[in-house]
From Swiss-Prot:
GO-annotated molecular function: ribosome binding; rRNA binding; translation initiation factor activity
Stretches assigned to the S1-like domain: 1-72
PROSITE patterns, per the entry: S1_IF1_TYPE
Protein name: Translation initiation factor IF-1
Organism the protein comes from: Helicobacter hepaticus (strain ATCC 51449 / 3B1)
Record bears the keyword NAD: no
One Pfam match: eIF-1a
């Protein structure tokens, strides 16, 4: 998958699940299952419920995504 194909959206973490997986509610109300990107995992960036995050969705599966940034 090329970098150009991703869809970037903002959302709010509503639930933390095992194995660095989170349920994120997007701005339009959809709920997506997301995991943390590798760079965030390497740098031990903690994500808690209530945090605003930027996620990437693929055009193939719009119900799973990758968290790439945690807003301050």
């Amino acid at each position: 998958m090329a970098k150009d194909d991703v869809i970037e959206v903002d959302g709010k973490v509503i639930e933390a699940l095992p194995n660095a997986t989170f349920r994120v509610q997007l701005e339009n109300g959809h709920i997506v299952l997301c995991h943390i990107a590798g760079k965030m995992r390497m740098h031990y960036i903690k994500i808690l419920p209530g945090d605003m995050v930027k996620i990437e969705l693929t055009p193939y599966s719009l119900d799973k995504g990758r968290i790439t940034y945690r807003h301050k």
